[in-house]
């Protein structure tokens, strides 16, 4: 997979945020993707001679602004070793269709459903535009 990514014109990464971080699967890919380019030299940090654009998208149950620090941390490293990064966070997501079924009383199911209907379509469109713009560049 790493060789296919090296030959690609761009890379789109996406993950839910679990316990304040990206999923274990994406974290494993991220580590292998970055580690292959580390030089351990002060004068040249990366062996990557062909940078590609990256889009990093996360979803979570908390408001999107809570994911800003997480995204910035990954963005900085990806930009240093893979290429320029654009990010998008979709927060306060609808986890299940029926919160009552699970007795999850800490969530306001109606607010989450309303957000999914009013805000999420715009976020989906924004994600689409990020990918479309990457292709144009």
Which role does the model predict for each range below?
Residues 1-81:
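Helix-loop-strand module that forms the ligand-binding subsite of alpha/beta enzymes
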Residues 75-137:
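Glycine-rich phosphate/pyrophosphate-binding loop and the adjoining helix
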